[in-house]
Design a protein with these regions (language model features):
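Helix-loop "lid/cap" segments that line or gate small-molecule binding pockets
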Residues: 26-27, 47-64, 117, 150
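Short, acidic loop-to-helix structural element flanking the phosphoryl-transfer center
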Residues: 81-105, 111, 115
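Conserved SAM-binding loop
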Residues: 12, 88, 103, 162-163
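An amphipathic alpha-helix signature
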Residues: 20, 24, 45-53, 73, ...
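Active-site neighborhood of HAD-like aspartate-dependent phosphohydrolases
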Residues: 1-39, 175
């Protein structure tokens, strides 16, 4: 038996623009920082608190205020929830349904956000296991999220493929010893942002263009 692990935001559902806007608004509310869109995409996969620390360190370079971090994380979650539902990328449900292997989701987002989106769009039995940012102590690029998924799938690293859309996710899969492909979808990132972590032939425009690769992998 083989397995495929999917990132959620930007791979399965078109939720990244809402994440980006929520981070921009919440950070601006408590600091004078204007967070660039690409910065969020490049750091996608980090757990929420780790991402805020990265933002403060990158833009201010000063000591991290734990209280401010908690306020930003809470406010970001509030703003994100106001966006309501998110559309699944075209073909995703059909493509995954046709894969005859184990399927998992690994996301740096909170358990509440992940389960709400998955249950709303896929149902609660569509994936064999789901690992969220609340389930682990270290987020991507640390291999822990993927190693936890391997454990829950009862599979070895060489039996699994990861589908990502962010450089940190690709790095995390490599650190876990798992092969990986990228589906860009509507990310502002390009091959230049991935060239240090993954070969060009493993980068696809979207899930539809990766369909044949995924089917061959499962077979």
């Amino acid at each position: 038996m083989k397995g495929i692990i999917f990132d959620m935001d930007g791979v399965l559902v078109d939720s990244m623009p809402s994440h980006v806007r929520a981070w921009q608004l919440s950070v601006k509310e408590f600091t004078n920082i204007n967070v660039e869109r690409k910065f969020v995409y490049r750091n996608e996969g980090r757990r929420s608190r780790e991402l805020v620390k990265e933002i403060l360190a990158n833009y201010q370079g000063n000591s991290v205020d734990t209280l401010i971090i908690e306020k930003i994380v809470k406010r970001k979650s509030e703003i994100f929830k106001k966006n309501g539902s998110f559309k699944v990328f075209p073909g995703v449900i059909e493509i995954i349904s046709n894969l005859e292997c184990k399927k998992a989701v690994v996301s740096g987002s909170t358990k509440e956000d992940v389960l709400n989106i998955i249950n709303q769009n896929f149902g609660n039995n569509f994936f064999d296991t789901i690992v969220t940012g609340d389930d682990i102590t270290d987020g991507k690029p640390d291999p822990l999220p993927f190693r936890k998924a391997l454990q829950e799938l009862n599979l070895k690293a060489n039996q699994v493929l990861v589908v990502e859309n962010a450089p940190l996710g690709v790095q995390a899969s490599k650190n876990a010893g798992i092969d990986c492909i990228v589906t860009l979808n509507n990310t502002p990132l390009s091959y230049e942002d991935f060239k240090l972590v993954i070969p060009k032939e493993k980068i696809f425009e979207d899930m539809k263009s990766a369909n044949k690769f995924l089917l061959n992998w499962c077979n």
